[in-house]
Structures are given as C-alpha cells and as structure tokens.
Regions:
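Single-stranded RNA-binding regions, centering on S1/OB-family and related RNA-binding modules
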Residues: 281-324
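The feature marks the mature, well-folded catalytic cores of soluble enzymes
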Residues: 1-282
Length: 324
C-alpha cells in the first residue's frame, strides 16, 4: 500500500488569516466573540471556545465591552452596520477574496447593473454577498439560471454582472457563463472562484485518478470539503469523507493499493497529520503482514529431499554431479 497526501491539503490563505486574527486577539487578552463560526470546522471552533472566544449568532448577543470578530465568510451590510451602531470594536476576519466580491456587487448596482450570484443560496458566504446588494439574484446551478432567463425574454437585455461563490467548482461557473452568454446582451463576468480552491480541486481530481481510494478530510458543514469529495468521486471508485482519523474505515482502506489524502480549506494541519499517521501505521502493518505471508509461502515451497524419494518435475540439465 502507498499513501499520498495532496500538497494543497489544509488551510487556505483566508482561513489561515481568520484563525490568526483570533489567535492574536487571545494573545492580547481581549474579551471577544465570533459572529458565527470563525471557519467551518467544529474542532477549531471548540478550541477557541476553550480559550474564551465563544460563538454568537447575532449582533444583539455581543456582550458589552467585547470585541466582535467577523467570520471568514463575511456578513451582510445590515449586520455590519448594526455592529457599528452599537459602537463595538470590530475585528474583520472576512476573507479578502470574499470582501472583493462585496465591492464588485456594490459597484455593479451603483452603475445600474444587476448582480447575478452563482452559489449555494443558504451558504454563509453567499448570504453575506447577497446582503451587500439591494436586489440580489442567487442561482445554485445552471438549470436554475436557465429557467429564470427563459421565464421572461425581456430579462435577456438587462445589464448583468455575474460573480461566483469563492468555493464553487470551475465546471459550475463555466456552465453558468455559457448559459448567460447565449442570451444576455449586456453581460460582464468576474471570475471570483478562489485560485487556491481551483488548484485544490484540480490537484484532488488528478490524485484521485491515480488512486484506488481517496480520503477527503474536513467538517461536513464545509462547502469546499463537500465539493472535493464530489470531484474525487468522479475519478476514484472509493471516496471516504471523514471528520478526523477516528472515522476512517480501516477494513476497507486496507484493501486499497494506493490511497490519496486531501482536505478542505478549513481543515487544521494536525487533523490531516493524524489521518496520514494512521494510514502510515496501517501501511507498515500491511507491509509486515505481506512479508510474513511471503516467508510462509516460501517455507511451504521448500521441501527436504532424501535418498529414495520420488518427485515429479522437468529435467532442464544433467551434469556429472547433479540433475536440474
């Protein structure tokens, strides 16, 4: 068995930055809360809760005298303004690539254009992006976009600005662009899929195509982790989505010759290392068992011959002192 770990597995820039801001806040001794989970990984959220940085759900829940840390997915303009109205210290951990999308949709509406957002409507990042628009339109896939455009041909001539959730797949984004290009007369695109996400997905697909089994490590609430599992499933017969090493299906994994490991953008390094370590231990066990099995077979194939014994075989050579 061989185990290969994707080079891109683990924290992306935005997640690393957000986690770093919380860690800095803790080091400075500030009282703080996060507005929603700082990232989509419950292990990280629990870690910070143990350090005194708990999660809240709304601006009204922020205790007096506490700083509020905005999650990496961002928040809507209304939420941001509600925090400012209370005079709270705001530590903005929004991913810079997500903040860029907020600016794009604001400028689009200021110029009389209609933002089209491609992404999962209920995902926190998409909810936040939509919250920076007066009249947001969100489409989860090309089918929904196609139906909306077909329902009223007059929509074809509206000025549209299209953006994507940063963790969307390139396939989804390309298919939506293709649909819009066919009928829309005033259309502009901003390729807002995070490059780290794009590279991670491409690497996962390439690795999955070379493996008998793929392990995708991450929180099940993580959108990019779920998409990685979906991408891997298109290239590999067995895909295991696990939260941590304790969820590994070891009996099935022992049957695989080559195993690949990748992880979502919000998966901590220590969890990836734990999974890799567990698989490496299995690999050592498998190799030892294979060696023992070979020795047993070799022993079974060696038989001591005595004078007078009869054997069945093929003679390949005859010498003065031996027969082969």
């Amino acid at each position: 068995m061989s185990v290969r770990v994707a080079a891109s597995a683990g924290f992306c820039f935005g997640v690393d930055r957000a986690v770093g801001l919380v860690e800095q806040t803790v080091r400075e001794g500030k009282r703080a809360v996060t507005l929603g989970p700082i990232i989509h990984n419950h292990h990280v959220v629990q870690h910070f809760a143990a350090l005194g940085v708990r999660e809240i759900a709304s601006p009204e829940e922020v205790p007096g005298g506490s700083a509020v840390i905005i999650r990496s997915h961002g928040v809507s303009r209304a939420v941001y303004e509600a925090l400012q109205a209370r005079g709270l210290e705001i530590i903005d951990a929004t991913c810079p690539f997500v903040s860029r999308i907020h600016r794009i949709v604001q400028e689009a509406e200021a110029n009389g254009r209609q933002p089209l957002i491609i992404g999962t409507p209920e995902h926190p990042e998409v909810v936040a992006i939509a919250g920076w628009c007066r009249h947001p339109l969100v489409f989860p896939d090309g089918e929904a976009l196609q139906k909306w455009l077909d329902d009223d041909p007059k929509r074809h001539d509206l000025p549209f600005t299209m953006v994507s959730q940063t963790t969307s797949t390139q396939f989804l984004w390309d298919s939506c662009k293709k649909i819009a290009k066919k009928v829309c007369t005033s259309l502009e695109f901003f390729d807002t899929i995070c490059k780290a996400t794009e590279n991670r997905q491409a690497e996962a697909a390439a690795l999955a195509a070379q493996c008998d089994a793929m392990i995708v490590v991450g929180d099940r609430k993580s959108s990019n982790t779920g998409r990685l599992a979906h991408i891997c499933a298109a290239h590999c017969p067995q895909v295991f989505l696990v939260d941590n090493a304790s969820e590994l299906d070891l009996p099935k994994l022992r049957q695989a010759g080559t195993i690949g490991i990748t992880a979502g953008a919000s998966t901590p390094a220590w969890i990836i290392k734990e999974v890799n370590h567990t698989m490496s231990e299995i690999n050592t066990t498998v190799d030892a068992a294979a060696e023992e099995s070979f020795e047993e077979l070799l022993g079974q194939g060696i038989k001591t011959l005595n004078t007078g014994d009869k054997v069945l075989g093929t003679v390949t050579a005859i010498g003065n002192t031996e027969i082969q």
